[in-house]
Amino acid sequence: MQAGRLSRRGFIGLAGLAALGAVAAGVGVLSRQREETGLITLYTFGDSILDCADYNERGVHPGQLLVRNDDGLFPDFRGQDLSSRGLARLEHRAVDGATVTGLPAQARDLRVEGRSIAIITVGGNDLLQDLVDDEGPGVATFAQALDSFVRSLPMRPVFLGNVYDPSFGDDTNNFLGVDPKLARKNHGRVNAAIAEIAIRYGAMVDLHQHFLKGDPSWFTYTIEPSLIGASEVRRAFLPSVL
């Protein structure tokens, strides 16, 4: 090869490096644009409290409403969403039926850029499956797993919703077939664990107390949020998210 001239292979190599540089620069520009324009991403993790679109006829879940309210369905919440305050997007990762052991899978291939916050609801299915009559280390094991997951998340703050009570505190509405006294004790233990963890990474959202003020129209299939319930979950998270 003569001095001062590039071979075809050398030219292709340099072109490839230039292309890679352009891609890297593009990613950097996108990240800076997201920060400069104030784009915020809301991440949802957890169970059907956040992944409840299949339980209402409009396919609505709380994360959608927090990012952009449906003004036709819920005119009272017009202007009360992240999109009204700037650029916002949703990354919905919560999965109906999830327990605490399923949370790490929801964060697989997670890539966080720019401003971001996370909301989590978990514990209800853990109670239904194992913890409602637990008299051993079950709640402590749940707490350790939840703390490990939240600690591993690359975004802050993280807002954790506690577990609501579809019986509205009325033992005559017991649908579990378990001594209500023991069930309520363990429900309280799970919520106490969630509260303790939430303080470390953001704050707790008290779904339990909020839903005690509601009525059966907030639920469907006994324990799932209805369309109204999805909006009420949104209502509970809204002050923290905004």
Cite the ranges covered by each PLM segment:
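Histidine-centered active-site loop/cap adjacent to the catalytic His
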Residues: 186-192, 200-203, 218-242
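Structural recognition of the beta-strand scaffold that forms the well-ordered cores
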Residues: 43-44, 90-94, 117-121, 159-162, ...
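Substrate-gating cap/lid alpha-helix
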Residues: 168-206
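Short amphipathic alpha-helices and their capping/turn segments at secondary-structure boundaries
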Residues: 33-41, 102-115, 145-154
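N-terminal secretory signal peptides and thylakoid transit peptides that target proteins
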Residues: 1-18
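Serine-esterase "nucleophile elbow" of acetyl-processing enzymes
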Residues: 28-94, 112-114
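A structural motif corresponding to the C-terminal end of an alpha-helix
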Residues: 80-86, 148-158, 190-205
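Oxyanion-hole/transition-state-stabilizing segment in secreted/luminal serine hydrolases
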Residues: 100-141, 165
